[in-house]
Design a protein with these regions (language model features):
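A short beta-strand motif characteristic of beta-propeller blades
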Residues: 17-22, 55-61, 97-106, 146-152, ...
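A short loop-to-beta-strand structural motif that recurs across blades of beta-propeller domains
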Residues: 47-49, 87-89, 136-139, 179-181, ...
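Structural signature of WD-repeat beta-propellers
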Residues: 43, 52, 83, 92, ...
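Blade/loop signatures of beta-propeller domains
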Residues: 1-16, 36, 44-45, 127
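Beta-propeller domains
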Residues: 40-59
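Beta-rich, blade/repeat-based domains predominating
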Residues: 23-36, 43-45, 63-82, 87, ...
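Blade-level signature of beta-propeller repeat domains, shared across WD40, Kelch, NHL, RCC1
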Residues: 247-291
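Short loop/turn segments that connect beta-strands within beta-propeller blades
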Residues: 51-56, 92-96, 141-145, 184-188, ...
Length: 291
């Protein structure tokens, strides 16, 4: 070892491989791939952006709040968690914004953070609560907007969500543990630990087609990849916070789902990098008849 040098793990991907997909965004946290062939992102003043894979940016709607995570249905409607409004809002392709879910049973959403659909159109939502208070929870919203608490015991700032292969479990980032847990969706069962980090703040998650889990860390500025045996590899790292600047959410995009797009809350752009293994396809349910 070189004298005076502290070694660290070598990332799998050099930062030079990352490119800017889109810039001029207002500190984007959420990013999602739509069934219409566009990338979607949000801004901290409520902006909703529709972005071509060539980088063309259009702001097509505004929630008026602070957009965190987002996903889409089969009719290209965007479902966005707005932490300032305390709601999951739905934005049509033409830009009309309405409330989809704000809580149930006398329990309002406190800090809605990330939504993900299953094949049946159930929308799972993380409600992070307040940092350090352990008051977060998971919700499930049925097609049409009626929701209920799914778990009260995933409370340590639940954040990014990813539906597991086969749809039998939900992987949940618990940012203040910090780590990732697996929540069974069929028949109840115990919450299981996927990985526990040290001195990191994980934020977003996404599966690839081989079942490996990509985890973006808000701090330090890293992306990790976890295999099916729970072994973690450093995928990318940016100690200068220029390419990956507080990376929050990430999504596999493009026609073949081989373009990994990363939102950098600390700056004004979306980054992208090509990967060898495509992402796991998402669900885009048709909800028009029940909404």
């Amino acid at each position: 070892m070189e004298v005076g040098k502290v070694p660290g793990p070598e990332p799998l991907v050099e930062l030079s491989r990352f490119e800017v997909l889109a810039e001029g965004l207002d500190h984007p946290e959420g990013v999602a791939w739509g069934p219409d062939g566009y990338v979607y992102a949000g801004g901290e003043a409520g902006q909703l952006y529709r972005i071509g894979i060539g980088g063309q940016v259009e702001q097509f709607a505004s929630t008026g709040g602070f957009v965190l995570g987002l996903c889409l249905d089969g009719d290209h409607n965007v479902y966005a968690c707005d932490s300032e409004r305390g709601e999951v809002v739905r934005a049509t392709p033409s830009g009309e914004v309405t409330t989809y879910f704000a809580g149930a049973g006398g329990r309002p959403l406190v800090n809605p953070n990330y939504p993900v659909f299953d094949a049946a159109g159930n929308l799972y939502v993380s409600d992070s609560g307040e940092w350090g208070k352990g008051d977060g929870r998971l919700w499930v919203v049925r097609p049409g907007g009626r929701g209920e608490v799914l778990r009260d015991d995933v409370s340590a700032f639940p954040n990014g969500l990813a539906l597991g292969p086969g749809g039998q479990h939900l992987c949940v980032v618990v940012s203040s543990v910090p780590g990732v847990v697996r929540v069974p969706l069929l028949g109840g069962g115990q919450v299981e630990t996927v990985i526990t980090f040290e001195q990191k703040v994980p934020d977003g998650v996404a599966f690839d087609a081989e079942g490996r889990l990509y985890v973006s860390c808000y701090s330090p500025d890293e992306i990790w990849r976890i295999d099916n045996l729970g072994r973690a590899e450093l995928f990318a790292s940016d100690w200068q916070r220029t390419v990956l600047a507080a990376p929050t959410n990430l999504a596999f995009c493009g026609p073949g789902l081989t373009m990994l797009v990363v939102a950098s809350l600390g700056r004004w752009h979306l980054g992208k990098v090509e990967v060898d293994v495509p992402g796991q396809p998402l669900h885009y349910p048709k909800l028009s008849a029940s909404s």
